[in-house]
Regions:
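Polar/charged, Gly/Pro-rich intrinsically disordered segments
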Residues: 56-93
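Short, aliphatic-rich beta-strand segments
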Residues: 16-21
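Short, non-transmembrane amphipathic alpha-helical segments
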Residues: 25-49
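A generic structural motif
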Residues: 47-58
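Short glycine/proline-enriched loop/turn "hinge" motifs that connect secondary-structure elements
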Residues: 8-13
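Short, intrinsically disordered/low-complexity patches at protein termini
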Residues: 41-42, 51-52, 87-90
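Active-site metal-binding core of divalent-cation-utilizing nuclease and nuclease-like domains
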Residues: 1-7
Length: 93
């Protein structure tokens, strides 16, 4: 059963569902990454969570994300430590 600890935040007037993933996410194909994000989005909505899913992962001592264009600058200034400190919900199915 998939199980994720997430940070459900409201930033810049938007609900954001930040999902920390394993570093192996970086090595998935673009298609597999999109499928994972879509699945997480459907499951988050099904759990009653409003917002857009943004996956984040650590690689080489740095955090990476796949975020909508307007949020990219926000995520450039966020660390994985900060994300983990803001974990406030769990998503599982």
């Amino acid at each position: 059963m998939p199980h994720f600890k997430i940070a459900h935040l409201r930033e810049q007037g938007q609900n954001i569902i930040i999902v920390p993933l394993e570093s192996s996410f970086e090595h998935k194909s673009d298609e597999d990454q999109r499928a994972t994000i879509a699945e997480l989005q459907v499951r988050a909505r099904g759990a009653g969570l409003a917002g857009t899913v943004v996956p984040v992962w650590q690689s080489g001592g740095r955090m990476y994300s796949i975020a909508p264009g307007p949020w990219r600058s926000f995520f450039q200034n966020v660390s994985m430590r900060s994300v983990l400190l803001n974990v406030n919900k769990e998503l599982y199915w």
